């Protein structure tokens, strides 16, 4: 039996999580495995109830779990708190740090049926694409020390430090090559090795790791060229392996060219296969409680959890196929429809119900 910590959070988090749990129960029944779920407060809801965005009780529940299914956190109510107390920073960074979740996987898929949503030219978007961005999460300029500000007046200076160790690059590289072996056997490593010492080390270590995966093609791109190529022809990519800063930027480009953040799941993993799974989008407080939120990113996050942490690949594939059927058959929330067709939009629960029925009938 697998134990899942459910951290629905704020905004639309609770309502899309209902649909993800519904789908999980459906595939568990279909594929004859057992899961248990336990709900815990996180983010703004936890601040209101416990005075802390990441309470001890929530952390204890996560420690006892086999995986974390995370919703979304934050909203205007908590926006004026000190930065270290804000839901997004306290909750997410606290969990990433405690569990050493160094690998972020964000699939970005555009199905031809939804090509009109993409910001790309129609001749590009109509081909569809399927890119997996693997981003190192715990190193790079975000966490390097020293950092800060010093001096006064016109001479005041802000500074940051960019660091990567051989160990950090090696472990994320192995995961990228292993992911490529399960896809289309190509890794594009992104760096700025013509300028940065960290990128020179990054490229060297990636090439050393690549020797262990002779069936996987490796190419290197400078980050500026990678950004340009993503919007020129995303179909050329399979797995993109990125340092923290570059991956942060490129994964958001991938999100934009799919046309909706409501479709994009993500996984954050450690070396033991423990992971936290969450939608790529935010808490969308402006539509919370209206029953119009798109639950697909949350549902696909549950599919990633089944694949990478719970060893239920067939169940994950069943969810993904059911989602594809929903999209192909026009079972869409309002964010996926042009303004003149939104009268035909399905509610959050209707989309979840349809996906469950597709799984049951497959």
From Swiss-Prot:
Binding positions (Mg(2+)): 224, 248, 252
Cited InterPro entries: IsoCit/isopropylmalate_DH_CS (IPR019818), IsoPropMal-DH-like_dom (IPR024084), Isopropylmalate_DH (IPR004429)
UniProt keywords, alphabetically: Amino-acid biosynthesis, Branched-chain amino acid biosynthesis, Cytoplasm, Leucine biosynthesis, Magnesium, Manganese, Metal-binding, NAD, Oxidoreductase
Binding site for NAD(+): 75-88, 282-294
PROSITE patterns in the record: IDH_IMDH (PS00470)
MF annotations from Gene Ontology: 3-isopropylmalate dehydrogenase activity; magnesium ion binding; NAD binding
Enzyme class: oxidoreductase
Disulfide bonds: none
Cofactor: Mg(2+); Mn(2+)
The protein's annotated pathway: Amino-acid biosynthesis; L-leucine biosynthesis; L-leucine from 3-methyl-2-oxobutanoate: step 3/4
Gene Ontology BP annotations: L-leucine biosynthetic process
Site feature location: Important for catalysis: 142, 192
Catalytic activity of the protein: (2R,3S)-3-isopropylmalate + NAD(+) = 4-methyl-2-oxopentanoate + CO2 + NADH
Residues engaged in binding substrate: 96, 106, 135, 224
EC number: 1.1.1.85
Family in the record: Belongs to the isocitrate and isopropylmalate dehydrogenases family. LeuB type 1 subfamily.
Assembly with partners or alone: Homodimer.
Function as written in the Swiss-Prot or TrEMBL entry: Catalyzes the oxidation of 3-carboxy-2-hydroxy-4-methylpentanoate (3-isopropylmalate) to 3-carboxy-4-methyl-2-oxopentanoate. The product decarboxylates to 4-methyl-2 oxopentanoate.
Name recorded for this polypeptide: 3-isopropylmalate dehydrogenase
Taxonomic lineage of the native organism: Bacteria, Pseudomonadati, Pseudomonadota, Gammaproteobacteria, Alteromonadales
Gene name of the record: leuB
């Amino acid at each position: 039996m697998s134990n899942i910590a459910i951290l629905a959070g704020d905004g639309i988090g609770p309502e899309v999580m209902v649909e993800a749990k519904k789908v999980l129960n459906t595939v568990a029944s279909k594929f004859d495995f057992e899961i248990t779920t336990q709900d815990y407060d996180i983010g703004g809801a936890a601040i209101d109830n416990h005075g802390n965005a990441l309470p001890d009780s929530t952390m204890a529940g996560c420690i006892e779990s086999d995986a974390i299914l995370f919703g979304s956190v934050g909203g205007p109510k908590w926006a004026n708190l000190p930065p270290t107390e804000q839901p997004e920073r306290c909750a997410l960074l606290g969990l990433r740090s405690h569990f050493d979740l160094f690998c972020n996987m964000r699939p970005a898929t555009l199905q031809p049926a939804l090509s009109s949503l993409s910001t790309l030219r129609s001749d590009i978007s109509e081909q569809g694409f399927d890119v997996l961005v693997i981003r190192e999460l715990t190193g790079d300029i975000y966490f390097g020390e020293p950092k800060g500000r010093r001096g006064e007046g016109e001479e005041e200076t802000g500074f940051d430090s960019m660091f990567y160790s051989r160990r950090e690059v090696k472990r994320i590289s192995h995961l990228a090559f292993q992911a490529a072996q399960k896809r289309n056997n190509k890794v594009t490593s992104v760096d700025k090795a013509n300028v940065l010492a960290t990128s020179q080390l990054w490229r060297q270590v990636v090439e050393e790791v690549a020797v262990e995966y002779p069936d996987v093609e490796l190419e290197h791109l400078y980050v500026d060229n990678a950004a340009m190529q993503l919007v020129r022809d995303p179909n050329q990519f399979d797995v993109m392996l990125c340092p923290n800063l570059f991956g942060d930027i490129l994964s958001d480009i991938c999100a934009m060219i799919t046309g909706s953040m409501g479709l994009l799941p993500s996984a954050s993993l450690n070396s033991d296969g423990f992971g936290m799974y969450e939608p790529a989008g935010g808490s969308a407080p402006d539509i919370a409680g209206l029953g119009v939120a798109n639950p697909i990113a949350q549902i696909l996050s549950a599919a990633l959890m089944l694949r990478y942490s719970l060893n239920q690949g067939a169940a994950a594939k069943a969810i993904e196929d059911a989602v594809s059927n929903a999209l192909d058959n026009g079972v869409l929330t309002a964010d996926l429809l042009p303004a003149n067709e939104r009268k035909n939009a399905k509610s959050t629960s209707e989309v979840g119900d349809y996906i469950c029925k597709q799984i049951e009938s497959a």
